[in-house]
């Protein structure tokens, strides 16, 4: 609009001519595979925590944000192109139709709650609590599992993008579709996170190997 006004000489110079946007990368916490397994296998004897844990694990294996996962109904589950069960529905944020194949753990959780009173009375796939309470319960679960990271409803989606998809060599274009991104540059942010993790892991491995080598040299000198 401003450029159009300058073109028509309604104004001589754009007031934003010297304005430059700056962007700051936001830290995106995610669970690694060990943390994900620890949470999934943890025995929780408090029902509300067990339900939130299961809903969170479901999001870790589907990439659904809280608002999308909470709205899922049994009607959204259908047979996909491969003959297996998929979730086929519109994503809340983009209103795009998405097709998400259900991985075994996600399917297991759906089966677990198909006869849950809340799910049956509200036609929902999962017994999800309010967003505010949900994050509070996630903090309790993290403490019980010995996970130091701050868990939120967003952490599960980041976990799906990094640990479940990209670290298992799922192509960036496929990850983009599964995450419902309209611009691959958004997905590439997760690619950079994965590269950083690989770099850190290799640095730790390098330090470990150097330590082993130093011990071997030390033992050789003693002998």
Regions of interest found by a model, annotated:
Residues 1-4, 19, 102:
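Non-catalytic DNA-binding core/recognition domains of DNA-processing enzymes
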Residues 7, 11-66, 168:
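Basic, Lys/Arg- and aromatic-enriched nucleic-acid-binding interface segment
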Residues 25, 92-111, 119-140:
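C-terminal catalytic core of Y-nucleophile DNA break-rejoin enzymes
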Residues 29-31, 35, 71-111:
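Conserved tyrosine-mediated DNA breakage-rejoining catalytic core shared by Y-recombinases
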Residues 51-52, 128-132, 148-168:
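Short basic/aromatic active-site micro-motif
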Residues 57, 61, 67, 157-182, ...:
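C-terminal catalytic core of tyrosine-transesterase DNA break-rejoin enzymes
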Residues 91-95, 131, 179-204:
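Catalytic-site neighborhood detector that most strongly recognizes the C-terminal catalytic loop/helix
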Residues 117-120, 205-223:
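C-terminal secondary-structure termini that scaffold catalytic or DNA-interacting sites
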């Amino acid at each position: 609009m401003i450029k159009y006004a300058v073109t028509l000489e309604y104004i001589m110079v754009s007031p934003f001519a010297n304005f430059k946007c700056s962007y700051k990368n936001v830290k995106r916490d995610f669970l690694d595979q060990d943390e994900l397994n620890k949470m999934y296998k943890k025995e929780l004897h408090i029902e509300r925590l067990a339900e939130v844990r299961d809903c969170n694990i479901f999001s870790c294996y589907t990439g659904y944000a809280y608002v999308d996962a909470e709205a899922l109904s049994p009607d959204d589950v259908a047979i996909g192109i491969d003959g297996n069960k998929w979730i086929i529905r519109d994503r809340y944020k983009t209103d795009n139709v998405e097709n998400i194949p259900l991985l075994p753990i996600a399917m297991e959780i759906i089966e677990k709650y198909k006869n849950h009173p809340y799910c049956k009375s509200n036609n929902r796939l999962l017994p999800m609590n309010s967003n505010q309470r949900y994050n509070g319960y996630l903090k309790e679960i993290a403490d019980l599992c010995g996970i130091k990271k701050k868990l939120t409803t967003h952490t599960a989606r980041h976990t799906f993008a990094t640990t479940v998809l990209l670290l298992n060599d799922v192509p960036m274009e496929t990850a983009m579709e599964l995450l419902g991104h309209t611009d691959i540059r958004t997905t590439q942010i997760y690619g950079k996170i994965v590269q950083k993790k690989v770099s850190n892991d290799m640095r730790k491995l390098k330090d470990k190997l150097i330590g082993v080598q130093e011990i071997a040299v030390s033992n050789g000198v003693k002998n």
